[in-house]
Amino acid sequence: MTKQVGKKFAWVIKNFSSLQCKKFYSVPFQIGDCKWRLSIYPKGNNCDYLSLFLEVADFKSLPSGWRRYVKLRLYIVKQLSTLIRKTHRWFDQEMWGWGFLYMLPLTKLHDEKEGFLVNGELMIVAEVDALGFIDPLNESEESEDPTQPLKKIKLNDDGAVSSDLLEEASPRKESMEVNGFQVLPSQVESVRLIFERHPDIASEFRAKNQYLRKACMDFLLSLVETLCQSLQEFSNEDLVEADIALTYLKDAGFKVDWLEKKLDQVRDKKEKERSCLAKLQETEETLLKLKQKCTELDALMDTEKAELSAIRTPLSFEDVV
């Protein structure tokens, strides 16, 4: 069962635990000028994790040299909360599918206490924001697909799906050059700030091809944006992907020692967060035990007060004679 509302696509897989196939596909759905589909490995893709990917369903029919830059959010909805994974990727004729190999441990997925499977059903929501594409006939332009009035799905605390009307339109945008890199107008200030603070960042970057130069700059901006996430949103997978992105940028010739230090700081803060969460959980458990003990002591005091009151009751005349 599927439902699409604007940029979000909801996919409910019934009898999920009964699936025997290695790979399972959703029906195609249209966002922008591409048809997309989700693919899932119910038993993991050679790992003990649920694997989930977004693919361009009609990539064979697209013109040679096509590219799409996509902001992707994948949600696995559970009863009380939602698992979210986010990434930013270029989709092209060589790499027309991206996703998460380690989306969710299978043991956690099938644990009834976790609440991912409800009556045997698994609900997945994909938010696909196709930001733009590079026209192979005109590399100086960067355009974005116009969006029509749409409804945006919101996930409630109980995992239900509701719809709010949201109208927005994105006009066609020209790319702009900043320090030799073609960027979108929305990226200009960020790129300028990077070069102001780190003027030699691209001094050893030798690529001349504008596609490659833009892809690398998008990679850099995505990495910075990733590091700006709150620690609560920052997952172990984000750390791994950030390391990969940093290595890619260094290999390409970018001087990103400053960014590596920031990543180390985030990694340290994430470790401290885990430690604090563990201590907090331990304190909460201790407090719960103390509260339980207080409740038991209150009940004991009430019993002893009643007993004392009974003992103090004076004898009546009839009791005495």
Curated annotation (Swiss-Prot):
MATH domain residues are 6-128
Chain segments annotated as coiled-coil in the UniProt record: 255-310
What InterPro entries does this protein map onto?
MATH-CC_domain_protein, MATH/TRAF_dom, TRAF-like
In its keyword annotation, does this UniProt entry include Coiled coil? yes
Q: Is Coiled coil given among the entry's keywords?
A: yes
Q: Which SUPFAM superfamilies match?
A: TRAF domain-like (SSF49599)
Which key words tag this protein in UniProt? Answer: Coiled coil
SMART domains, per the entry = MATH
Q: Which domain of life is it from?
A: Eukaryota
**Record's CDD domains?**
MATH (cd00121)
Q: Return the Pfam families for the record.
A: MATH_2 (PF22486)
- Its protein name is MATH domain and coiled-coil domain-containing protein At3g58410
Say which species the protein is native to: Arabidopsis thaliana
